[in-house]
């Protein structure tokens, strides 16, 4: 009995030395880190110097087009320093850019908001393979993941794409999106009238 108690005490001593502070996981627009909400309070809770962090982040993302959302991971050290890891933009961002749309479909399985070719998928996979979580995955696995993401966004993956037909499709899609926005606005107004 006493041996097991002494083992537990020794394990507790080792466990006390491990730092289990939470990582900050958030998306920050490239070159637009500011001390205001929502980023400032998140950094303040973890005792990070907000001004130094914003300056560091904006310097690291100076070569990227401003406003692109970048998934960021921040690990805080006990001495208030931090380790900053900036990933590539999300897959959905790349897919929407390749498809030429600003937003995904409201009903992804039933509705198609855009189209991309397999070549687009391959090029995006090459970019995403530089991300730390995907470094050890094969390009085939990343392409499969991107095709699944495209499906959830309402983007169809095709072998070839005709430019004229796709332009007509996008024009038609633009009118559909306008109708959807009007419908949503009407629902919001009706809800406001009910609650007022």
What are these regions (language model features)?
Residues 7, 15, 32, 75-79, ...:
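N-terminus-centered regions that define maturation/targeting leaders and the start
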Residues 11, 36, 44, 67-68, ...:
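Generic ordered-secondary-structure signal
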Residues 112-196:
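Positively charged, low-complexity, intrinsically disordered RNA-binding extensions
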Residues 42-131, 135, 143-144:
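Long, charge-patterned amphipathic alpha-helical coiled-coil/hairpin "stalk" segments used as oligomerization
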Residues 9-13, 24, 38, 59, ...:
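Sparse, context-dependent recognition of short Cys/His-centered cofactor- or disulfide-binding micro-motifs
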Residues 26-28, 74, 84, 121, ...:
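Generic structural hydrophobic/aromatic packing signal, biased to beta-strands
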Residues 1-48, 175-196:
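Intrinsically disordered, Lys/Arg-rich N-terminal extensions and targeting peptides
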